[in-house]
A protein has these predicted regions:
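Catalytic cores of carbohydrate-active enzymes
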Residues: 6, 128-253, 295, 299-328
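Exposed alpha-helical structural elements
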Residues: 74-77, 221-228, 340, 361
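Non-catalytic C-terminal accessory modules of carbohydrate-active enzymes
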Residues: 231-232, 263-265, 276-375
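Carbohydrate-binding/catalytic loop surfaces
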Residues: 2-24, 55-66, 92-118, 173-203, ...
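Acidic surface patches and DE-rich sequence motifs
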Residues: 87, 170-171, 354
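Aromatic-rich carbohydrate-recognition surfaces in CAZymes
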Residues: 1-92, 122-126, 130, 267-290, ...
Length: 375
């Protein structure tokens, strides 16, 4: 179906893995970007011909399928799934069960009988798909296959551009930003000047991927307004997921309301999300602010740590009322360290490999006289 599992276990040989089969819409977008980056760094196009299998979904789990396809076939399946879940009314990607911020799992809910999900949208995932469309076009063009898909993906790119411009850009007349998303039939929004709970709320990831995906080049929201979003989200431990947080009585947003203020995804510094914002700041040539974020996020700079001091944790909590100041839920999150490294390579050093070469962006600010990078 082109819908990968959210999580899976590595079972003993011959055994069936356990899988998290919830329909988070963003599962495939990371796969496309990962393979694109692998090709850009290595030039190893043979991987696209590698044969790999599938698991079929059955009640209560999965079973190994007899079907075997190439890696490229799998990528096309992923893209098919994603583009068929673009909401035709708005040109943006439906949220389904949710996106990277899995605590905000209410946008995809529907009240229509017979339907599992509605037409609520994740703007972050929409922008990730926008990036995937360009990546897949480059891959297919490079290996000279599927010109019909290249044309289709170009059409979908334009559909998303228009959808973002019309529905995801919000303004109060003096400033603009990219909203986080909306619920069924656009009956309520998140990350706007007047959210579902009546507050003016800033969201980090949608504004970050507006820049990372290069949608920023369309000029729908100014650099000054995007930087202003991150200034409002900044805190003692770095960029927060949201500001303000979601109170327990906030309707329609999902289980995030059950998280205490300033913890996990509910208005805390979640490392991945903060680094997405940091990369966006680097790409906007806001180097001094970006390095300030790096300093806040590194555990070695903290006076108090509740997890392993030399390992990137997943988040930092801050809630004065609950006596929380820098606590982390858990560490040994290799994804946090990985995202930090990618942010330094792309952001600090400006190194962006592509299928046709290497682009190096010269930054306006650097905090030291010299530094080196070996890839």
């Amino acid at each position: 179906t082109g819908n990968p599992p959210r999580q899976y276990s590595i079972p003993p040989k011959g055994a069936t893995p356990l899988m998290d089969l919830r329909d988070f819409i963003d599962q495939g977008v990371w796969i496309i970007s990962t393979i694109y980056n692998y090709l850009a760094y290595t030039g190893d196009y043979r991987i696209l011909n590698e044969k790999t299998g599938y698991y079929d979904r059955v009640p209560g789990g999965v079973v190994l399928s007899k079907r075997v396809d190439s890696v490229l076939d799998h990528m096309i399946q992923v893209m098919d799934y994603l583009v068929t879940h673009i909401d035709e009314n708005t040109g943006c990607l439906r949220a389904m069960y949710g996106d990277w911020n899995d605590a905000l799992d209410g946008l995809g809910i529907t009240h229509e009988k017979g339907k599992e999900y509605g037409d609520g949208v994740s703007v972050m995932a929409t922008l990730q798909l926008y990036m995937n469309l360009r990546e897949m076009k480059e891959i297919l063009t490079k290996i000279d296959v599927h010109p019909e898909l290249v044309a289709l993906y170009s059409n979908k790119e334009e559909q998303i551009r228009q959808g973002i411009k019309k529905y995801a850009v919000v303004s109060n007349g003096t400033e603009s930003r990219i909203c986080h998303g909306w619920g069924e039939h656009r009956s309520y929004y998140v990350g706007t000047f007047n959210d579902v709970d009546g507050v003016n709320r800033y969201s980090s990831t949608s504004n970050a991927f507006y820049v990372i995906s290069n949608m920023f080049k369309e000029g729908y929201v100014s650099k000054e307004d995007i930087v202003n979003v991150f200034k409002h989200l900044d805190s003692k431990y770095g960029i927060k997921t949201f500001e303000p947080y979601f109170k327990p009585d906030c309707k329609g947003v999902g289980r995030i309301v059950n998280l205490p203020k300033g913890t996990a995804e509910n208005g805390a510094t979640y490392i991945h999300g903060a680094l997405f914002g940091t990369l966006a700041l680097f790409m906007l040539n806001e180097g001094e602010m970006a390095y300030g974020q790096i300093e806040k996020l590194l555990p070695i700079t903290h006076s108090i740590l509740t997890t392993t001091p030399f390992v990137m944790p997943n988040s930092y909590s801050y809630n004065v009322e609950e006596d929380m100041d820098g606590q982390s839920m858990s560490d040994w999150y290799t994804g946090s360290a990985n995202t930090l490294i990618k942010t330094l390579v792309k952001g600090s050093f400006g190194v962006f490999p592509s299928l046709d070469g290497l682009k190096i962006e010269i930054r306006d600010y650097f905090p030291s006289k010299s530094a080196s990078l070996k890839v």
